[in-house]
Amino acid sequence: MTVNDAVVKRIKQLLLEKKMSQYRLEQQSGIQHGHMQWIMSGKSKTVTFSTVLRLANGFGMTVLEFLDNDMFLFENLEVE
């Protein structure tokens, strides 16, 4: 799985866990709807660190908490 795939998977996981809509995440993170759609559709090939910061903040967590999942372990990722 690519890093971007892992980010999308983590977003979906957290949306379910927190019973949060994508719209609410967009509002709380400051990420525009079009950009979020681009990420969630897999069309975005590079999710920047600043976007991950915004996502984590939107979920009310730190970046470390956002990335605290086995899907982000090096051996589980296709790193270019």
Question: Model segments located where?
Answer:
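Residues within the helices of the helix-turn-helix
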Residues: 12, 23, 53
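Short, charged recognition helix plus adjacent turn
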Residues: 13, 67-80
